[in-house]
């Protein structure tokens, strides 16, 4: 083969770049520096530089970025064996060693017990999709990521890995958010919806995209576009509220900010969830657990919950994740979990909406899990009697491409060998999965610049943008006699739920409310243990139960309000029921994840509140119990209506 040479990693980086740029007279392409530095497979054919992923000494179609993606997919598909195809169809959790190494070591924490080591999964099961839970600092994560890609490069076909994550830019304590750590911190998605500004939503997504790319996260297990039509549901904070039009608007901007106009090497691919809408949960319980398998539609409002997904389809979301729930009382849909449900995945999603992107299940539909000493049964609702092989077969026959939180490719291999699934059906899913990897540019440049990770993640301008959004999202619900804004450094203030050191920058902090001119307190929407969660510590992480304050907790709040004029701020991760607190407060504000400084900047007039309620606040628990789980803003005589918000 003419002018074929392998370029080893020898000498300085500058020398290597010079070799690549100027060797031969017909230079045509320049490889990105991370590939130059990290890849051991760079070759030159006719002065065209590429990665010889299958190590056969020649330029294959799938290795050639000049070729159409569909041609590259078909070339690679022909070279893959059944085991490699099956491995593509699983999204396995993985853990990151704190020192950035990729070698297997004993699990040391709660989340690590759920997460096998990535290199083991690559070597034994050909898995190339991994999602992260807890992670180390950005620079360490970047080192780990490059080492993982380097290991993937050594595989028979050199197929790069894809790393995914749940949201990492909120830190309000939501169970479904990964800790922001050094990532820029923003209000919950509910707070961004309270602002309602599509340009700001796109800005947030673009900033988060840059941070994700800096550490190698190429797929986001969000946005969550469920409609918050049931006030008691624990997952409201991750939504854009209960209004379908607002949610669709936010969804469009969100996807554009992460993916761009089309998916490219600069994109983070979206996995929009939870199709066909996870909001209408009976009494606000959640189908993560066996005590609540079915979604209910007493208002016959199934189609309303599809509206945000229609916006996601128009925005070309890379992937869709169905929820765990079972559609109850819907004549067109079988009463089995959505990912097991061919009428949902094939008839509705594939055929009606002509969606040809990736469909990935929510996590843990096939295998029972053991988390520490806790048993966590598979969410195989409606098909509990099926064994693992039958569950996997049922999911794939429903039209799903990928199984989240599982690592069972050997089952797919056996199903094909037994004639229960065709390899052609497996190929359909693998084509979609490969297409996304190619579109993301992972076959050309899977590596990142480790030196830039710490510079990009959480940089000052990103942090400032997040703090500004927190301030802007704060929603003023009551301002008796224009009590707000308060005068800075002129008042004695009593605070509760606020760091006194932060408060001291705004006034003289006193410990006795009777000596204060004003009290400022921060509350969180209540939650209570329910009988169904008894003996289930995992369910205890979910905020279930009534939405109103009770007993001594309520008495103490009301007593304070009667002792001193009180400014009340409440964090809304669900729709709080606070009529007595509102009535007695001098001023009332709502937040959706905001720092003490962001709140006090608004209270003391450095910034104006700009939020409007993305969910209504009911006036009583009776009204909550009487509303219909699938219908928006339908509680009787709400205390504060959807869209309400004051300013000054």
Which residues does each PLM region occupy?
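Phosphate/pyrophosphate-binding active-site segments
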Residues: 443-444, 448-449
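Short acidic, glycine/serine/threonine-rich loops at helix termini
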Residues: 172-179, 231-236, 280-287, 331-334, ...
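Short beta-alpha connecting loops at secondary-structure transitions
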Residues: 235, 290-297, 330-335, 369-400, ...
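Extended catalytic-interface subdomain
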Residues: 323-329
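Short glycine/threonine-rich loop-to-helix capping motif typified by GTGT followed
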Residues: 237-239, 331-342, 460, 499-505, ...
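N-terminal beta-rich core of secreted/periplasmic extracellular enzymes
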Residues: 30-276, 306-321, 335-408, 421-442, ...
């Amino acid at each position: 083969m003419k002018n074929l040479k392998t370029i080893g990693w020898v000498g300085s980086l500058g020398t290597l770049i010079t070799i690549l740029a100027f060797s031969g007279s017909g230079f045509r392409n320049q490889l990105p520096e991370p590939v130059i530095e990290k890849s051991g497979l760079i070759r030159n054919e006719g002065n065209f530089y590429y990665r010889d992923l299958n190590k056969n000494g020649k330029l294959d179609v799938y290795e050639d970025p000049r070729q159409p993606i569909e041609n590259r997919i078909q070339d690679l598909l022909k070279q893959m064996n059944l085991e490699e195809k099956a491995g593509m169809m699983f999204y396995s959790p993985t853990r990151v060693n704190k020192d950035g190494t990729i070698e297997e070591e004993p699990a040391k924490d709660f989340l690590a017990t759920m997460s096998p080591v990535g290199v083991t999964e690559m070597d034994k099961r050909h898995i190339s999709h991994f999602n992260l839970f807890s992670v180390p600092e950005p620079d360490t994560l970047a080192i780990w990521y490059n080492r993982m890609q380097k290991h993937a490069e050594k595989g028979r076909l050199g197929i790069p890995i894809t790393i995914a994550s749940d949201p990492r830019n909120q830190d309000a304590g939501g169970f479904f958010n990964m800790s922001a750590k050094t990532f820029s911190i923003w209000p919950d998605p509910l707070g961004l919806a309270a602002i309602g500004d599509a340009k700001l939503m796109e800005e947030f997504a673009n900033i988060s995209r840059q941070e994700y790319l800096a550490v190698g996260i190429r797929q986001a297990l969000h946005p969550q576009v469920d409609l918050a039509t049931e006030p008691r549901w624990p997952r409201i904070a991750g939504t854009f509220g209960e209004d379908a039009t607002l949610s669709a608007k936010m969804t469009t901007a969100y996807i554009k900010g992460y993916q761009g106009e089309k998916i490219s090497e600069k994109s983070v691919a979206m996995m929009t969830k939870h199709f066909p809408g996870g909001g209408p949960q009976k009494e606000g319980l959640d189908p993560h657990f066996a005590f609540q398998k079915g979604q209910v539609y007493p208002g016959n409002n199934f189609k309303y919950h599809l509206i945000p997904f229609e916006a996601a389809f128009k925005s070309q979301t890379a992937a869709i994740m169905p929820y765990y729930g079972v559609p109850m009382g819907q004549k067109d849909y079988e009463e089995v979990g959505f990912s097991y449900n061919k009428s949902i995945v094939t008839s509705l999603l594939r055929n009606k909406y002509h969606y040809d992107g990736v469909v990935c299940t929510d996590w843990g539909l096939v295998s029972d899990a053991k988390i520490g000493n806790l048993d966590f049964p598979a969410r195989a609702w409606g098909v509990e009697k099926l064994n693992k092989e039958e569950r996997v077969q049922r999911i794939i026959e429903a039209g799903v491409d990928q199984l989240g939180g599982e690592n069972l490719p050997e089952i797919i291999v056996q199903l094909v060998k037994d004639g229960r699934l065709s390899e052609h059906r497996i190929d359909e899913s693998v084509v979609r999965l490969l297409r996304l990897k190619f579109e993301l540019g992972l076959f050309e440049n899977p590596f990142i610049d480790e030196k830039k990770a710490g510079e990009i993640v959480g940089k000052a301008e990103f942090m400032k943008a997040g703090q500004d959004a927190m301030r802007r999202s704060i929603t003023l619900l009551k301002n008796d006699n224009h009590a707000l804004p308060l005068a800075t450094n002129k008042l004695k203030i009593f605070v509760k739920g606020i760091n006194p050191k932060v408060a001291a920058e705004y006034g003289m902090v006193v410990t006795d409310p009777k000596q204060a001119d004003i009290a400022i307190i921060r509350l969180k929407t209540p939650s209570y243990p329910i009988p169904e969660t008894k003996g289930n510590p995992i369910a205890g992480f979910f905020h279930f139960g009534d939405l109103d304050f009770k007993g001594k907790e309520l008495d103490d709040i009301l007593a304070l309000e009667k002792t001193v004029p009180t400014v009340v701020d409440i964090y809304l991760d669900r729709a709080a029921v606070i009529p007595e607190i509102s009535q007695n407060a001098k001023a009332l504000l709502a937040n959706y994840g905001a720092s003490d400084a962001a709140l006090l900047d608004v209270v003391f007039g450095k910034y104006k509140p700009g939020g409007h309620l993305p969910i209504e606040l009911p006036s009583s628990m009776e009204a909550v119990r009487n509303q219909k789980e699938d219908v928006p803003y339908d509680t009787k005589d709400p205390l504060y209506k959807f869209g309400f918000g004051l300013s000054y």
